[in-house]
């Protein structure tokens, strides 16, 4: 449905704030084409709505005459709350808040496009809620355990049992982030249940 450059409407970008179910404000940018249909764009780990992937996707959709909304998950970018590693279910609920906001304003969310961690959150959303038929997975992980081995090493479970915690060097969360047995297991396996 690409439109000719001559017929293409001028798009408006508008900052929109949407509360999630925990009362945190999710901040996003609406790329308005004037159509009822809209696509939700979800960023990856250590990124935000201003990431070049999100802005490029919004530009491509604009050129096709499709409205989109790119936003910061809780604890990322301008959105309220604290950053948490492995918070896929919380981010799926952020997507829910965004989807409901647009559905309540008589918009039709035609797709969710997620990159990396955002793709995993979008897939979890789709597994729980069945209201959006198109989910686009851009580099989401097919097996979250692979990510654990990559970040913590192949012996992470043995070290976790022995020491009770694992340290991860993470620039976005300070010099070191510690994971206890409980929060690492919740991260690793809650998504799979």
Task: Give the predicted meaning of each segment.
Residues 36-44:
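Short beta-strand element of the alpha/beta-hydrolase
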Residues 46-58, 73:
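The serine-hydrolase catalytic nucleophile loop
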Residues 49, 76-107:
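Catalytic nucleophile-loop/oxyanion-hole region of alpha/beta-hydrolase
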Residues 58-80:
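Conserved alpha/beta-hydrolase
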Residues 120, 125, 129-193:
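The alpha/beta-hydrolase serine catalytic core
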Residues 2-34:
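N-terminal cap/lid segment of alpha/beta-hydrolase-fold proteins
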Residues 105-116:
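Alpha/beta-hydrolase fold nucleophile elbow
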């Amino acid at each position: 449905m690409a439109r000719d450059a001559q017929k293409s409407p001028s798009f408006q970008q508008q900052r929109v704030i949407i509360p999630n179910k925990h009362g945190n404000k999710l901040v996003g940018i609406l790329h308005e084409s004037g159509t009822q249909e809209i696509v939700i764009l979800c960023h990856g780990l250590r990124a935000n709505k201003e990431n070049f992937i999100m802005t490029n996707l919004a530009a491509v959709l604009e050129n096709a005459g499709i409205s989109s909304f790119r936003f910061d998950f809780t604890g990322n970018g301008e959105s309220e709350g604290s950053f948490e590693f492995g918070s896929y279910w919380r981010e799926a609920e952020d997507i829910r808040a965004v989807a409901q906001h647009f559905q309540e304003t008589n918009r039709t969310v035609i797709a969710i496009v997620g990159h990396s961690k955002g793709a995993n959150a979008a897939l979890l959303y789709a597994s729980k809620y069945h209201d959006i038929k198109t989910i686009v997975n851009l580099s989401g992980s097919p097996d979250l355990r692979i990510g654990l081995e990559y970040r913590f090493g192949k012996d992470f479970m043995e070290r976790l049992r022995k020491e009770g915690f694992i340290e991860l060097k993470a620039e976005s969360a300070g010099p070191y982030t510690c994971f206890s047995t409980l929060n690492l297991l919740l991260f690793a396996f809650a998504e799979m249940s």
